[in-house]
């Protein structure tokens, strides 16, 4: 029963974390920047936000973004962080699909428990790789951006990335280390067989 609960916890945690990584990848509020001194920006009420795909200006009644489409003039760290976040988002899809197939409520024919166990281990590895890509990108980007401009604060995109990466890392570790062995994956299923006393007699394996 404990292994079953940990499998579900690992799946839910990883799924929520993956959504956070996707939000971070697709939004541009990574860091809040200031083109002047911080007191001047606050007095003018003019701040900027910088992300992977656009630089934005936020002022009273104005929000304008300039897409970063010219790859040749983009800083190397922006391109590298783009690649890392895209890789993290893509890795999450097969990891979540694999975790779906190993949940206790899902049964694919009469497959042995070792097959589910191997899929769970692969999903756990993918989730840890996802988390590492997101962690590197969300730390590297603000450090390098600080060298180019004054950073006032971190944006919600960066916080979503940190939370998502940690959740994926926790979910992957739970799946790899705590969700049981091949025997546990084989026992966490329910099946039905006909009994002599009634036409439909439910029988369940020990969990």
Swiss-Prot record:
Residues 23-82, 144-157 are extracellular. The keyword Nuclease does not apply. Keywords: Cell junction, Cell membrane, Membrane, Phosphoprotein, Tight junction, Transmembrane, Transmembrane helix. The chain crosses the membrane at residues 2-22, 83-103, 123-143, 158-178. It is found in: Cell junction, Tight junction; Cell membrane. The keyword Oxidoreductase does not apply. One of its GO terms (molecular function) is structural molecule activity. It is a multi-pass membrane protein. One of its GO terms (biological process) is axon ensheathment. One of its GO terms (cellular component) is axon. The modification Phosphoserine is found at residues 193-194, 197-198. It comes from the Eukaryota. It holds the Pfam family PMP22_Claudin. Gene3D superfamilies: 1.20.140.150. InterPro entries: Claudin, Claudin11, Claudin_CS, PMP22/EMP/MP20/Claudin. Residues 1, 104-122, 179-207 are cytoplasmic. Plays a major role in tight junction-specific obliteration of the intercellular space, through calcium-independent cell-adhesion activity. Interacts with tetraspanin-3/TSPAN3. Interacts with OCLN. Belongs to the claudin family. This is Claudin-11. It comes from Macaca fascicularis (Crab-eating macaque).
């Amino acid at each position: 029963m404990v292994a079953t609960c940990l499998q579900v916890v690992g799946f839910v945690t990883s799924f929520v974390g993956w959504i956070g990584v996707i939000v971070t990848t697709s939004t541009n509020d990574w860091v809040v920047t200031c083109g002047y001194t911080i007191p001047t920006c606050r007095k003018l009420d003019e701040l900027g936000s910088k992300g992977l795909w656009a630089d934005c200006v936020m002022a009273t009644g104005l929000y304008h973004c300039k897409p970063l489409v010219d790859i040749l003039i983009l800083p190397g760290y922006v391109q590298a962080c783009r690649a890392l976040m895209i890789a993290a988002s893509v890795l999450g899809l097969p990891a979540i699909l694999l975790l779906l197939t190993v949940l206790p409520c899902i049964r694919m024919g009469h497959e042995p428990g070792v097959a589910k166990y191997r899929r769970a281990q692969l999903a756990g590895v993918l989730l840890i790789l996802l988390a590492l890509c997101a962690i590197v990108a969300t730390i590297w980007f603000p450090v390098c951006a600080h060298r180019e401009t004054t950073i006032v604060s971190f944006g919600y995109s960066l916080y979503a990335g940190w939370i998502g990466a940690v959740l994926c890392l926790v979910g992957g570790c739970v799946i790899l280390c705590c969700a049981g062995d091949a025997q546990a994956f084989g026992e966490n299923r329910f099946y039905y067989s006909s009994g002599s006393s009634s036409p439909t007699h439910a029988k369940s394996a020990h969990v």
